[in-house]
Regions:
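Short acidic/polar mixed-charge low-complexity motifs
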Residues: 13-15, 26, 86-88, 112-114
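Short polar/acidic secondary-structure junctions
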Residues: 10-12, 84, 95-97, 108-110
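Short, solvent-exposed loop/hinge segments that bridge or flank secondary-structure elements
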Residues: 4-29, 36-48, 52-71, 93-95
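A short, polar/proline- and glycine-enriched secondary-structure boundary/capping micro-motif
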Residues: 39-45, 87-90, 114-119
Length: 122
């Protein structure tokens, strides 16, 4: 899943941001490179927990996806994803689909969660 991905809001179905996923020593992480909504360009993670070093930091440039490891043919799991809008962190699972053109990002707590489809941007 290394590369740039356009995140698609699972409710509005509109492009939300671009997240770049990188791999280092077998661990994958993702940083926000771009936010599409002009009104949110200067967004900060105001809702992040007080003990999270990302609290109050700009969302653009922020690492929101951490700790993913390859867990099978096209599955990456074991990491977490931060939703900067609400400051909550979820268990993350990524499945590469459609020959690498898209990925399914599943964020969950226990068995409750939601899935977004991200589209390759590069």
């Amino acid at each position: 899943p290394v590369g740039a991905w356009t995140t698609i809001d699972d409710e509005s179905k509109k492009p939300k941001s671009v997240v770049r996923i990188v791999e280092r020593n077998g661990v994958y992480s993702g940083m926000v490179e771009k936010i599409f909504d002009p009104a949110k360009q200067d967004s900060k993670c105001d809702e992040c927990a007080s003990d999270d070093p990302r609290k109050g930091q700009p969302v653009i440039g922020m690492t929101i996806l951490t700790g993913l490891k390859h867990n099978g043919e096209s599955v990456y799991a074991g990491g977490s994803i931060l939703d900067p809008a609400n400051g909550k962190t979820y268990n993350a699972k990524v499945t590469v689909i459609e020959g690498g053109k898209k990925l399914e990002m599943r964020g969950s707590v226990l068995f409750i969660g939601r899935t977004q489809t991200w589209v390759r941007a590069d």
